[in-house]
């Protein structure tokens, strides 16, 4: 059921002003090949692509598009979706940009960021301005508007830690809504927007960031050690958020392939959460197993460690293989050395091969992280 929230007056006014001279045809590419619009570089032919350059275009565009029978599908940066060969849908591609300071004092700053802004560029912008909290999320691909859907996270930080509010358009009812953080129902790699996939177009995301350069989160992996070496190279004895950001960028660049060079959609599997008792049993058999206590009863296990330990790094079913340096990432080799683009079926073959292998060896079920889209633009949890 859709939560009930008040319409944003400023957004509604902007939309109404655009109605009189709105020309939908200027925004449409038809038919549209989406190969360049998804980081896995899967060939996907859609009915049409509607590029929304201004927030004021959202309401009139959707009103006109819904006069037809074809479903609507929101495609942001395309970094977390597995697309079909044919997509019988009208694809909405929001690219509007802008960053506004809503409030600021000596301790913090509140921002509102348009959904078309590049996520990593936002992280760089905030840290370089002395606004901290997003630095651990550096180099995550995609756009700001898609970040809440998956509640993106990395190196001990999740988006929800800094998020304050969201403005979004509900496609089924064609109404604007404001969400506080609590309304978003965030969980590990999950949110209301993911649970109600395909129903929302997020246009603005609000953040509250701090200005305390001594407050860092560097307890994850090798971040602290590398961040300290960066600080010392700059003649500083204590690490700051900028050191954490650059350390994470260095780590990610050393382990993760650039989607522009070797197509991928980032971490393909979620880190599974298992019972602490099961983890203790596995730890007895595999002393090097990597896990992080969630609570007294549950431990989160590093999926990459499981895949690597199972001997699956660099393995899979051509042309989709796990990356040679980071087993958690599936890469599409067909984009480099084949005239035949990879398909959903190719990805599914490698996905299920890895899932079976991990289940057989460790008794753990791996869950896919990117969302699966069928030809009718429906998001599916399976296969």
From Swiss-Prot:
It is found in: Cytoplasm. Residues 42-212 form the FAD-binding PCMH-type domain. GO terms for biological process: cell division; cell wall organization; peptidoglycan biosynthetic process; regulation of cell shape. This is UDP-N-acetylenolpyruvoylglucosamine reductase. Pfam families: FAD_binding_4, MurB_C. Its EC number is 1.3.1.98. Its main location: cytoplasm. It comes from Psychrobacter sp. (strain PRwf-1). The lineage of its organism: Bacteria, Pseudomonadati, Pseudomonadota, Gammaproteobacteria, Moraxellales. PANTHER family: UDP-N-ACETYLENOLPYRUVOYLGLUCOSAMINE REDUCTASE. Its cofactor is FAD.
């Amino acid at each position: 059921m859709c939560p009930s929230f008040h319409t944003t007056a400023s957004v509604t006014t902007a939309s109404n002003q655009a109605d009189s001279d709105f020309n939908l045809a200027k925004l449409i590419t038809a038919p549209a090949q989406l190969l360049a619009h998804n980081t896995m570089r899967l060939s996907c032919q859609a009915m049409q692509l509607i590029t929304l350059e201004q927030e004021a275009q959202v309401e009139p565009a959707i009103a006109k598009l819904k006069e037809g029978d074809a479903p609507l599908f929101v495609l942001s940066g395309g970094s977390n979706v597995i697309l079909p060969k044919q997509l019988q849908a009208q694809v909405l591609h929001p690219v509007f940009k802008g960053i506004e300071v809503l409030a600021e004092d000596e301790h913090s700053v509140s921002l509102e960021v348009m959904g078309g802004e590049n996520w990593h560029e936002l992280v760089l912008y905030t840290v370089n301005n002395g606004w901290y909290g997003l630095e651990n999320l550096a180099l995550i691909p995609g756009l700001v508007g898609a970040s809440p859907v998956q509640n993106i996270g990395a190196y001990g930080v999740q988006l929800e830690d800094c998020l304050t509010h969201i403005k979004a358009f509900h496609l089924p009812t064609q109404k604007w809504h404001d969400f506080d953080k609590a309304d978003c129902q965030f969980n590990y790699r999950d949110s209301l927007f993911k649970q109600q996939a395909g129903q929302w177009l997020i246009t603005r995301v609000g953040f509250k960031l701090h200005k305390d350069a001594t407050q860092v989160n560097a307890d994850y992996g090798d971040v602290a050690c590398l961040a300290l070496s960066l600080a010392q190279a700059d003649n500083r004895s204590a690490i700051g958020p900028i050191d954490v950001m650059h350390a994470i960028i260095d780590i990610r660049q050393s382990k993760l392939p650039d989607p522009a060079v070797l197509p991928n959609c980032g971490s393909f599997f979620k880190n599974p959460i298992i019972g602490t008792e099961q983890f203790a049993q596995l730890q007895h058999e595999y002393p090097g197993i990597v896990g992080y206590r969630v609570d007294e009863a549950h431990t989160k296990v590093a999926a990459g460690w499981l895949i690597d330990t199972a001997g699956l790094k660099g393995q899979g079913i051509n042309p989709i293989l796990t990356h040679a340096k980071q087993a958690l990432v599936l890469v599409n080799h067909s984009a480099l050395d084949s005239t035949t683009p990879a398909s959903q079926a190719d990805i599914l073959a490698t996905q299920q091969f890895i899932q079976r292998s991990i289940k057989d060896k460790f008794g753990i079920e791996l869950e896919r992280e990117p969302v699966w889209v069928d030809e009718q633009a429906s998001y599916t949890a399976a296969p």
